[in-house]
Amino acid sequence: MVSQTAAAAAPADPIVDVEMESAEDAEAAKKDAELLAVQEIRDHARQIDKAVVSKEPRFILRVLRSLPTTRRKLALVVVRSLAVQLYPAGPERDGIMAYIEDYPAGAQEPELPRPRAAIKSPVPEVDAYFHLLLLVRLLDKNDLPKATKCSQDLMAKVVGQNRRSLDLIAAKSYFYHSRVAELNNDLESIRSFLHSRLRTATLRNDFEGQAVLINCLLRNYLHYSLYDQADKLVNKSVFPETASNNECARFLYYLGRIKAAKLEYSVAHKQLVQALRKAPQQAAVGFRQTVQKLVIVVELLLGDIPERKVFRQAALRRSLGPYFQLTQAVRMGNLQRFGEVLVNFGEQFRQDHTFTLIIRLRHNVIKTAIRSIGLAYSRISPQDIARKLGLDSPEDAEFIVAKAIRDGVIEATLDPEKGYMRSKESTDIYSTREPQLAFHQRISFCLDLHNQSVKAMRYPPKSYGKELESAEERREREQQDLELAKEMAEEDDDGF
């Protein structure tokens, strides 16, 4: 019996060992990842120091581009270790530690290699970058009270320094400062601060700072539906052409929203399509969803029907569901279904800031219905039109048809005496200017794309040409080469 019990218990021992080993392996992998994160951010600090010394902002730009990856590695042990390595003991380190929580009670402090404490304070650029990392970490933890205080301290550091090497980090800091104010529903309080920083950035030719601040101000105005002020800002300021693609995409989206609210649908559609093209195609799914919703509504307002493949994209299919139903209602000219879509999805349309534009679509639904009626019937009475559109009286139908004829929606004539609408024969679209205008639009886009590509290329500095010889020097050198060749030929002849 004893031997059988021992035999039965024997296979269980290796399982326990495997579980313990797997737990130890996971703990070791976690420590390695944290150590690598510390080393990576330390390397970022060295890159920033190199940029300050060499006056080359591209090193800082490279560090900031990796911010989305870095923010996922900001564990508690990582930021505490970095604070010790970057800041010497004193009030400065204590101020930084105020934004980093202590280890949980009863939890054992992770055993990373003992960090080498800093001897002197970091340069302002490294200080601002680490402060920015702390602010991003607090936002990810949804600790708004600490994030607000951290953001204010970061702005004090940025404003207090007059260094061009700090411009790129300052631009990123402005964005997160505005984000904190938005989460606190207090965007109005920072508007004057953003305006003052925009004036300073413009005077200093800080192009990235200008782009970020203009976008923050536009978002600030649009949050409160201040379209007139936003339009004035766009007209009075110049968005820098050298701004990053992400900032250009944001600016074009805000510009599209402003133009759509101002009834300039063609311009709005052009800006929104450019925003979609400039946005990252694989990442930034939320931004693409937001822009695509507005593009669909603007296309419907222009009288166009979006293609079905737009709604079939995997990343957009679910979010564009209500807009697909809206498109179907407009395409069929069904007023009843249009009203049902507004009732069912009105709250979502308000959250997407498209409800006001969608209300304007009622006229387009009626126009589409009248156009389809005009194509289907060569002659129809106002009573039948009123019944098909669900209108109250034939007089309303007659008024709507007359307005549609005046606007060029349909080619027809009204005969009040006989009481019917007679449709004219449809003309061939290729005999009009429509194809010419469509080709012109495509050619203009290709030319603009070519010009932007040429501007985005990097060229050698002008000093490169100074080392090249002039035409006169080249002629003298060629003459000397010819004389030398003749002398060598004569020497060869003498040798024979």
Curated annotation (Swiss-Prot):
Classification via InterPro entries: 26S_Psome_reg_C, CSN3, PCI_dom, WH_DNA-bd_sf
GO molecular function, one term: enzyme regulator activity
Keyword annotations: Proteasome
GO BP term, pick one: ubiquitin-dependent protein catabolic process
Entry-linked Pfam families: PCI, Rpn3_C
Annotated signal sequence range: none
Region Disordered, residue ranges: 458-480
Record SUPFAM superfamilies: Winged helix' DNA-binding domain (SSF46785)
SMART domains reported in the protein's UniProt record: PAM, PINT
Superkingdom of source: Eukaryota
Biased composition (Basic and acidic residues): 464-480
Gene Ontology cellular-component terms listed: proteasome regulatory particle, lid subcomplex
Family: Belongs to the proteasome subunit S3 family.
Subunit note: The 26S proteasome is composed of a core protease, known as the 20S proteasome, capped at one or both ends by the 19S regulatory complex (RC). The RC is composed of at least 18 different subunits in two subcomplexes, the base and the lid, which form the portions proximal and distal to the 20S proteolytic core, respectively.
Chain's role: Acts as a regulatory subunit of the 26 proteasome which is involved in the ATP-dependent degradation of ubiquitinated proteins.
PANTHER family: 26S PROTEASOME NON-ATPASE REGULATORY SUBUNIT 3 (PTHR10758:SF2), 26S PROTEASOME NON-ATPASE REGULATORY SUBUNIT 3/COP9 SIGNALOSOME COMPLEX SUBUNIT 3 (PTHR10758)
Protein's name in the database: Probable 26S proteasome non-ATPase regulatory subunit 3
